[in-house]
């Protein structure tokens, strides 16, 4: 549903830096690190950030388990989602009907008809005036999966072994670990989650 897609925006609440010179891959990886830290603190009461670079010294989380969590978020894209209200949808329907009407009128005119040029200009102007809707940041399944690797000392330029999605052993087990963010969300919301 639209509400479920909008809810994925919780994980888009990371630092955003679009300044020139930003390494896009480093920014993407840093955003995932931030998502994992937020998920751990908010949903599990655990600080997971230390395990980004090494096995956690206080919480029973290994670096391998950290990157297994990383794998859940690594295969997501970060699009904007349009969320039109009922009013905007109604205005768009009216707008679409008017566009269709002008297109029909245009198709009935001969190529040399003097009325054609002003009608084409009106149609172009009308198409640009399509009612807009609010947008929100969401997460979506990536079309082409990325390979997830553990990073030596948390450095994305030093990839190590390949990692499969999974959850920390200190928490209850994920029944079907197939790398799906929806399965992860269901696991987080499970009654067995502390």
Regions found by a protein language model. Name each.
Residues 2-13, 80-194:
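Short, functional "switch" segments adjacent to catalytic/cofactor/reactive centers
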Residues 3-97:
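Sequence context surrounding c-type heme c attachment/ligation sites in exported
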């Amino acid at each position: 549903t639209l509400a479920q897609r909008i809810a994925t925006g919780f994980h888009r609440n990371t630092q955003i830096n679009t300044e020139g010179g930003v390494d896009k891959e480093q920014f993407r990886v840093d955003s995932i690190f931030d998502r994992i830290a937020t998920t751990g603190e908010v949903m599990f009461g655990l600080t997971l950030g230390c395990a980004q670079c090494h096995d956690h010294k206080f919480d029973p989380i290994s670096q391998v388990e950290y990157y297994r969590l990383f794998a859940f978020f690594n295969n997501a894209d970060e699009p904007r989602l349009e969320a039109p209200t009922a009013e905007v949808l109604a205005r768009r329907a009216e707008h679409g009907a008017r566009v269709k009407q002008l297109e029909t009128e245009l198709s009935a005119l001969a190529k040399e008809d003097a009325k054609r040029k002003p009608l084409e200009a009106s149609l172009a102007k009308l198409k640009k005036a399509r009612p807009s809707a609010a947008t929100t940041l969401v997460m979506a399944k990536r079309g082409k999966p990325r390979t997830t690797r553990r990073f030596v000392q948390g450095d994305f330029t030093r990839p190590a072994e390949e990692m499969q999605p999974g959850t920390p052993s200190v928490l209850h087990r994920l029944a079907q670990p197939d790398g799906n963010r929806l399965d992860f969300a269901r696991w987080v919301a499970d009654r067995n989650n502390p």
